[in-house]
Amino acid sequence: MSDPVRVGIIDHGSGNLHSARRALRQVGAEVIVSNDPSALLDTDALVLPGVGALAVCMTGLRAMGGARLVRQWVDEGRPLLGICVGHQMLFERGRERDVDVKCLGVLPGVVEELPAERLPHMGWNTVTPATDSALFQGVQERFYFVHSYGVVVTGPHDHFTTATHQGATFVAAAEYGPVTSTQFHPEKSGIAGLALLTRWLNQLS
């Protein structure tokens, strides 16, 4: 029997740490949660969670050395999973409540308020897989979203799996080199979310 995948969850002060840790353990990962970058270096993959305001998450991440850790990690081609605001933090920048936020610049795109009459987008939604998706091809399940901001896209994309809320199509997930990220919460998406996390872990082993 092979050793479990060791996953480090970055604790920058604004994330669903308990839910993410529990879900990853359910699918067989060994999980370490830490706000010390040096404690996370000896893992097989990182998870960048995030809830609340993008600016607050970025400030917390920079303060604990996580921004430098993420960029170094991705530059080395090591696998990383962003969740919800953690997904948004991976893009170039964001604009939230008239505040411009410089993000990590790992993924191309800008986070903005979704052009929809009813916000937040909260509840279950289906996704349209990216043309070269390894994780979502053939997936019919719905995933749990709760957000008002996202990266709006038009048309099919090689790296972005999309979802639509009230006519606004946005990035629901990204698969970009070593980086995977989801706007939805896999850890709150029941069986579908656990299956997705299992597929992600299987890519690492």
Swiss-Prot record:
Q: Which UniProt keywords apply?
A: Amino-acid biosynthesis, Cytoplasm, Glutamine amidotransferase, Histidine biosynthesis, Hydrolase, Lyase
* Any single Gene Ontology cellular-component annotation: cytoplasm
Under Gene Ontology molecular function, one entry of this record is: imidazoleglycerol-phosphate synthase activity
- Glutamine amidotransferase type-1 domain segment(s): 6-205
* Top-level lineage group: Bacteria
Pathway annotation: Amino-acid biosynthesis; L-histidine biosynthesis; L-histidine from 5-phospho-alpha-D-ribose 1-diphosphate: step 5/9
Q: Which catalytic residues are annotated?
A: C84, H185, E187
Cross-referenced PROSITE patterns: GATASE_TYPE_1 (PS51273)
Gene3D superfamilies annotated for this entry? 3.40.50.880
User: Which SUPFAM superfamilies does this entry report, sorted A to Z?
Assistant: Class I glutamine amidotransferase-like (SSF52317)
Q: Which reaction does it catalyse?
A: 5-[(5-phospho-1-deoxy-D-ribulos-1-ylimino)methylamino]-1-(5-phospho-beta-D-ribosyl)imidazole-4-carboxamide + L-glutamine = D-erythro-1-(imidazol-4-yl)glycerol 3-phosphate + 5-amino-1-(5-phospho-beta-D-ribosyl)imidazole-4-carboxamide + L-glutamate + H(+); L-glutamine + H2O = L-glutamate + NH4(+)
| EC number annotated for this UniProt entry | 4.3.2.10, 3.5.1.2
Q: What is its main location?
A: cytoplasm
CDD domains under this entry?
Answer: GATase1_IGP_Synthase
Q: Where in the cell is it found?
A: Cytoplasm
Question: Could you give the subunit structure recorded for this chain?
Answer: Heterodimer of HisH and HisF.
What's this chain's function?
Answer: IGPS catalyzes the conversion of PRFAR and glutamine to IGP, AICAR and glutamate. The HisH subunit catalyzes the hydrolysis of glutamine to glutamate and ammonia as part of the synthesis of IGP and AICAR. The resulting ammonia molecule is channeled to the active site of HisF.
Name of this protein: Imidazole glycerol phosphate synthase subunit HisH
Q: Which organism is it from?
A: Cutibacterium acnes (strain DSM 16379 / KPA171202)
Q: What is the lineage of its organism?
A: Bacteria, Bacillati, Actinomycetota, Actinomycetes, Propionibacteriales
Q: What is the gene name?
A: hisH
